[in-house]
Regions:
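Iron-sulfur-associated redox domains of electron-transfer enzymes in respiratory
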Residues: 1-203
Length: 203
């Protein structure tokens, strides 16, 4: 016998603010943190340090788009060319997301071993540990499967780690600060170039 499925019902509460459909909400989302907004901020720097971090996926897309002839180009050379252009537009620091990604993986590893050790001692931490750099997935878990939240890793994503690097290392170095502070962090404008609109959910 066939199982009769119930009719699915979708409400605005189910929206993940992704780029999968064209709605007024998506239009607002795309309009926020846009290229036009970045240009306006660059035209009014007010003594702030401007840091931009570019993901490897975005670098690959830029290489495919802007290389005039089909030939190999190393990631380092490509990033150097893009960095030169971005600095001419007003950015002080151009960074690759790879460092932040490696730091995030190491932090996830430490969290996993800490959870495993705690489970053997008092069972307080849940395993398996679910880890994802996709804020859309985390948003989905929060809205639709709250029972999974104890299993979701608390470690920062690569994009969040990049934000910490920008606010505490790259920015203060550019501003000439001896150490990072809250006031110094406010004087750092950080832009991240990522391949998905969902990344705006954690920006």
């Amino acid at each position: 016998a066939r199982t009769r499925l119930e009719t699915a019902q979708i409400s605005l509460n189910d929206c993940l603010a992704c780029s999968g459909c064209v709605t007024s909400a998506e239009t607002v989302l795309i309009g926020q943190q846009s290229i036009d907004e970045v240009r306006q901020e660059l035209n009014d720097k007010r003594g702030r340090a401007f840091v931009i971090t570019i993901s490897s996926q975005s670098l690959a897309s830029l290489a495919a788009r802007f290389l005039q002839e089909k030939r190999y180009i190393s990631k380092g050379i490509l990033l150097a060319r893009i960095a030169a252009k971005l600095r001419s537009l007003g950015f002080d620091v151009v960074a690759d997301l790879s460092l932040a990604r490696h730091l995030a993986v190491r932090a996830h590893t430490r969290e996993f071993f800490a959870r495993r050790a705690a489970k053997h001692i008092d069972g307080s931490f849940k395993l398996p540990m679910l880890a994802s750099a996709c804020p859309g997935w985390v948003c989905y878990a929060e809205k639709a499967h709250s029972e999974l939240l104890p299993y979701v890793a608390a470690t920062k994503s690569p994009q969040q780690v990049a934000g910490v690097l920008a606010k505490r290392i790259y920015g203060p170095q550019t501003l000439g600060a001896l150490q990072a502070s809250e006031n110094c962090a406010r004087d750092v404008y950080h832009v991240v170039v990522m391949p998905c609109y969902d990344k705006k959910l954690e920006a």
